[in-house]
């Protein structure tokens, strides 16, 4: 079980201290104030020096991110410095290229899919996971849960996928998935330090308490 904290470049040294009990820092580069490649490179190296794994994420506008003009160049230059890279399944114009890059650099590629409105039918979830695995190593499926049944359907739809995966039910109903997902093979859960980055996200403090309560390793 690994806990990831999405971060920007704001108060970076303070974040390193506050996040010391987390495992991974997700660099949301699309939300950085300073997107200079050499600057971001320096922060990635500093995170590694402080014992964190890192996820490079440059989220697209259509999945909740901000526009980045030189997005592909940033992937090219920064991927070698990060343990994982996250690319949206919906980024159809560049996903095949990013997939090839990840293989060249021998880096793990997270292929993510977000639905902020609903949890689709089970066969749609399974097909989305299969499509994600065409390009990457780790499917990340984040769906809005409008009932506890939606949470259960997501978890059960992916239970036969034996490769590493990330399963998230968003919203109030989905809060339980942030910790229960580990039981169904989800190996990363995202938490926050100051304010949630996604609906239903738990704080790092809450996640650590739940991890201890349920003896999750």
Curated annotation (Swiss-Prot):
It catalyses: 3-dehydroquinate = 3-dehydroshikimate + H2O. The keyword NAD does not apply. It is an enzyme of class 4 (lyase). Pathway: Metabolic intermediate biosynthesis; chorismate biosynthesis; chorismate from D-erythrose 4-phosphate and phosphoenolpyruvate: step 3/7. Keywords: Amino-acid biosynthesis, Aromatic amino acid biosynthesis, Lyase, Schiff base. The keyword Ion transport does not apply. Gene3D superfamilies: Aldolase class I. Its EC number is 4.2.1.10. 3-dehydroquinate binds at residues 26-28, 59, 178, 201. Belongs to the type-I 3-dehydroquinase family. Homodimer. This is 3-dehydroquinate dehydratase. It comes from Hydrogenobaculum sp. (strain Y04AAS1). The gene is aroD.
